[in-house]
């Protein structure tokens, strides 16, 4: 099959412009969240601890926020955990606690900084994939980074919920169960665990009364089953 000429089919200047617009318009600090700190503790206990990762495993926390996952892993004596994020305030908070945080686009981790193919043991991707405008590229990049049979934890908001995650300013990919499973299969991952969690939450907004809503998340553990033949 003859390959398409990318110089004719893709406007790289426009792609760069669109990305810069997203960065300047829609990146903001998560800030402290008692709910997400509590949920992260439960996630690590339920999904990460049973993996029995080596203490020197290379671990990436994509979209690390203020560093709640990094806190948990530090308490467990993991020695090689790196956060990735673009929110200046959250990065500053995480670094103030002694964590290493890199300012990378989570879909494109630079090889020139030493992030070679199959160099990572585990990726933590909690409430980050929905922020990717191109989730299939994001998952392709994580396939590149992960060692063969490396693991990844994914947690994403479910579509069509009371909370209307689709309308959050920096949410671009609120994936349903089938679409998420299909993307993982196409990018070389095997789903080991696919759970749905639901709970009641109180939403607080400035100058508005508190609102009770149903939250619904998908929680997955996946394994890199095969590398992608895209070179």
Language-model regions, residue ranges each:
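A short SAM/SAH-binding and catalytic strip from SAM-dependent methyltransferases
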Residues: 122-133
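Conserved N-terminal segment of class I S-adenosyl-L-methionine
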Residues: 1-118, 122, 137-139, 215-219, ...
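A short glycine-rich, Lys/Arg-flanked "PGG" loop and its adjoining helix->strand segment in the class I
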Residues: 136-148
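Core SAM-dependent methyltransferase catalytic element
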Residues: 202-231
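Short glycine-centered segments of the SAM/dcSAM-binding site in methyltransferase folds
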Residues: 58, 149-151
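Short alpha-helix
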Residues: 172-187
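Short, glycine-/aromatic-enriched active-site segment of Class I SAM-dependent methyltransferases
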Residues: 154-173
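Conserved S-adenosyl-L-methionine
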Residues: 189-200
């Amino acid at each position: 099959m003859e390959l398409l000429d990318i110089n004719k089919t893709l406007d790289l200047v426009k792609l760069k412009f669109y990305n810069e617009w997203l960065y300047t318009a829609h990146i903001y600090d998560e800030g402290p969240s008692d709910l997400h700190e509590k949920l992260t503790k439960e996630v690590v206990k339920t999904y990460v601890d049973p993996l029995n990762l080596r203490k020197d495993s290379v671990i990436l926390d994509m979209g690390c926020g203020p560093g709640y996952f990094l806190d948990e892993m530090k308490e467990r004596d993991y020695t090689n955990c790196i956060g990735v994020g673009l929110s200046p305030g959250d990065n500053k908070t995480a670094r103030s606690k002694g964590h290493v945080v890199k300012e990378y686009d989570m879909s494109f981790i630079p090889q020139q900084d030493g992030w070679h193919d199959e160099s990572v043991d585990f990726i933590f991707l909690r409430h980050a994939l929905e922020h990717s405008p191109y989730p299939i590229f994001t998952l392709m990049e994580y396939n590149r980074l992960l060692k063969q049979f490396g693991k990844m934890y994914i947690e994403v908001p479910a579509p069509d919920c009371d909370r209307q995650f689709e309308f959050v300013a920096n949410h671009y990919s609120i994936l349903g169960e089938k679409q998420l499973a299909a993307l993982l299969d196409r990018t070389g991952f095997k789903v080991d665990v696919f759970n749905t969690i639901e709970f009641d939450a109180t939403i607080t907004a400035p100058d508005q009364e508190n609102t009770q809503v149903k939250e619904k998340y998908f929680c997955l553990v996946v394994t890199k089953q095969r590398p992608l033949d895209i070179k």
